[in-house]
Amino acid sequence: MEIERESSERGSISWRASAAHDQDAKKLDADDQLLMKEPAWKRFLAHVGPGFMVSLAYLDPGNLETDLQAGANHRYELLWVILIGLIFALIIQSLAANLGVVTGRHLAEICKSEYPKFVKIFLWLLAELAVIAADIPEVIGTAFAFNILFHIPVWVGVLITGTSTLLLLGLQKYGVRKLEFLISMLVFVMAACFFGELSIVKPPAKEVMKGLFIPRLNGDGATADAIALLGALVMPHNLFLHSALVLSRKTPASVRGIKDGCRFFLYESGFALFVALLINIAVVSVSGTACSSANLSQEDADKCANLSLDTSSFLLKNVLGKSSAIVYGVALLASGQSSTITGTYAGQYIMQGFLDIRMRKWLRNLMTRTIAIAPSLIVSIIGGSRGAGRLIIIASMILSFELPFALIPLLKFSSSKSKMGPHKNSIYIIVFSWFLGLLIIGINMYFLSTSFVGWLIHNDLPKYANVLVGAAVFPFMLVYIVAVVYLTIRKDSVVTFVADSSLAAVVDAEKADAGDLAVDDDEPLPYRDDLADIPLPR
């Protein structure tokens, strides 16, 4: 097995303390000064990349599936979930980027140094499970694409996905940037199709605006669909990924350099997620308008009743005519493959950060994909396309329930003076992010408990079987609650931000509560060579 172990264990002291002894500090500091003299737009372009790579996760097959079903089942009533979800995603993605810029380490590495061994292993397993859960919609979406393009059974397409992404990763050495550009363009081809269809079906603007700004959960399954939407939008592994991707950029370690880096990554993420918001709104609106049309044929009405990725190409007939299925299939294939690449990198950084293990990308992809294929293959054989579509919703709900175990550490670390120094979150960001975070966590816990209790009451199992199931599941629910509370109330014990005395007086004067924490304006942010092989333009 091709595994590389890092030669030494990282200490708990930040890179700013160790960099002071670097023999090349003066040379790198001069490079920093040259970087800071460049025009702002050039420095911004140097930071472009991580946000757009992360935003691909908001256009993956899981998002498309939940968007299509939300529109078909509830028209525009759940658009507010997408709006709140992407606003929250922008906040936490920017916090993840800030964490990487300020500390020079990504979220998984900081979790490893902060938590006890048992907790660290627990968080690592949950993070790996999140990557696998995120990969399931990509496996099924790609299988649906093969079914649409080549008319092969879905379960055969699931097997093919085990090698398709490996081939794509292998082709990167022949032109990574061109390959990524091609994939992105194919994904946006589908976006353009939905925008074109949107201009034809013309959904009522008033209803769309009401759906965006008036929260409603009417009708059967609205709560489950809303949680699935959140799970598809706010993915735990994306937080690990974004905090690592920013380390591939050479950000000067001066006060201005750090602030500029955080600001540039915020602008880039904001633009990328705004585009993702528009695309998600377009998909929901097209689905809601087309499936509620008075002129809908009986065949299309039957498809709307059980809408899934493999039956949605008819929504684009007005734009593409007979070729709608082919274009939709190609775009769906691109969506699944591009999202899988980001998932592969996220899994690599999670393993490297928690365990200090670096695995070859093809091996990492093979491991994740093999595990993700198993449930997809079983469900597609037994339940066919309909069962596979339901599995996507279940995977999205799993992601939503796993969110606290990446979100709470991120919120605590980015708000901690010992981790971020004077760059920690403002009180407004702390209050708003914790409010939304705890709200989502509370909704998930409420839905989990009420859904399970309702299932126990109304299922057809014998009473003794219900007792056994309840006795097995309720302890896990208790462990879930205890784990969330533990992560929330536990105090940070490891300092990752070490001040330099040369600027302590300045920072103390500007910020009375900064204590002895300051920013070393002379030491360069270490370029992470171990994270530099990311396929992004520099």
Swiss-Prot record:
Recorded topology in the membrane: Multi-pass membrane protein
- Compartments, record wording: Membrane
Keywords, alphabetical: Ion transport, Iron, Iron transport, Membrane, Transmembrane, Transmembrane helix, Transport
Q: Would the keyword Ligase be found if you checked this record's keyword annotation?
A: no
The record ties this protein, via HAMAP family, to: NRAMP
In terms of PANTHER family, this protein maps to:
METAL TRANSPORTER NRAMP5, SOLUTE CARRIER PROTEIN FAMILY 11 MEMBER
- Return the similarity comment: Belongs to the NRAMP (TC 2.A.55) family.
What name goes with this protein?
Metal transporter Nramp5
Q: Which organism is it from?
A: Oryza sativa subsp. japonica
Traced from the root, the source organism's taxonomic lineage reads:
Eukaryota, Viridiplantae, Streptophyta, Embryophyta, Tracheophyta
